[in-house]
Amino acid sequence: MNALARENGTYAMVAMDQRESLRKMFRDRGFDDSHERMRMFKTAVARELAPHASGFLIEPEFLEHVQPFVPRGLIMAVDLLEQERGGIVEDTRLDEVERVPEGVVALKLLVIWRDDDRRRERIEMCERFVALAERHGVLSVLEPVVREDQQILAAARELGATRPSLYKCQAPRQGDVVARCREITEVVPVPWVVLSQGVPPEEFPLAVEHACKGGASGFLAGRALWTNTLDAEDPTELLRTQSVPRLNELIEIVDRYA
């Protein structure tokens, strides 16, 4: 796990593999959603944030553009998203890549967990994903996402059992959050980190604190770090003056509580 962890064994990672959801953010702000704008933004985030992080997540389409700016912990998404323009991710499939680019140290798979008749199918996909990463000699980062807050633990119990290298989990939002995070720690047999989807950026530091108090080992966050820069034609200055301090604040929280 040293390929993604910091010296003290914790994780402070940046997610930049958003696809249609990021395009929609650009459109909502009056910008075009072209490949060039996506490339520009993702490259800027990598250039400014990756040097401060222990890992950086990107999809294959933009990997070669960000790789020069990622000094360590390069994670490649291998999820194929079923997502209509402007909509949410409805489902995912595993892209069983035949080769992993040099420099990539981990693969990541997003899974939409539901309590339906396809649960066994999703478990098998996660098992294939873990085996795929092992076959390529890299780590596996599994990211199950649920629609209802109360489903987080069920998904963790079911899919954490496939034993990825690292489990990426939503932050519980209701009830005794620290106690709920302890329950996640009890059922997931591998280290886990919290993601920022669904959490307002200003509330994410507290979510990280609660998660780490409950046994999480850090975070893999995207929107909580860079959403505030989307209104700028060139996000560089805001990334430097707002996103980097925000990332460092989260790292301090992890160091204190993880």
Functional labels for PLM-detected ranges:
Residues 1-116, 202-205, 209-218, 223, ...:
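Alpha/beta catalytic barrel-like cores
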Residues 113, 146-147, 173, 225:
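Conserved beta-strand edge residues that scaffold enzyme active sites
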Residues 133, 159, 211:
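Hydrophobic pocket-lining residues that define ligand/cofactor binding sites across diverse proteins
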Residues 139-148, 170-172:
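Short, surface-exposed recognition loops or helix-turn segments adjacent to catalytic cores
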